[in-house]
Amino acid sequence: MKKITVILILLPLCIFGQEKKTVTKNFRTIVGAGIAGGQTGISPVFDLSGGITYSRYFTGIGIGFDSYQFDAFPIFADWRVGFGKKQLLFAYATPGYVIPERHNNEGAPSRVDRMQGGFFLDAGMGYRIPVNFMHRISFTAGYRHKSLSHQITYNTMCGAVPCVEIPPTIYVNHYKYGLITTKLSWELGR
């Protein structure tokens, strides 16, 4: 019994542990500019996001500007994951909601235009080029989806006496754009 007790007491002295790497959380800001191309041409796009990196993952929130067909401001969550030892290659996804710019009434005063936002997604692959320990330049290529709806209401004026109320004529157009994007981004942070 004494031998077993001595062995159990001395056994921890022979065990070697591996040193665990410490993974820190860091803040990162990403500013991107590029073009989005679709069936009716190309337009500039801009994105700004900030968030936290942990290991090979980045999670943040952002806002952007998309001028394809209708000017709009996407608000999105930004998720990225790096591949490889240096994490130069990465995949990204930015789901969110797109807020259209206010649309001015066009034509007669009896016409009312109203834009409504919808689903937004930008996803693809990218490659980082380290400039120094705090700065990186990245190139991305991906797919961008933007959904909007445009409601046009025509109010018919009364032109004769006695006036008979005529219900307004309402047209609703739903737009869903699938675009190919390419962006150049600057990443600041570890």
Residue ranges and their predicted role:
Residues 15-29, 160-162:
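Sec-dependent signal peptide cleavage junction
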Residues 30, 45-47, 76-78, 122-124, ...:
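Membrane-embedded beta-strand positions in outer-membrane beta-barrel channels/transporters
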Residues 49-53, 80-82, 126-128, 183-187:
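Transmembrane beta-barrel domains of outer membrane proteins
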Residues 25-38, 44, 56-69, 91-98:
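Transmembrane beta-strand segments that form the barrel wall of outer-membrane beta-barrel proteins
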Residues 174-190:
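Outer-membrane beta-barrel "beta-signal"
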Residues 65-155, 175:
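Outer-membrane beta-barrel translocator/channel fold
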Residues 4-13:
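Sec-dependent N-terminal signal peptides
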Residues 24, 54-57, 84-86, 130-134, ...:
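Outer-membrane beta-barrel channels and translocator barrels
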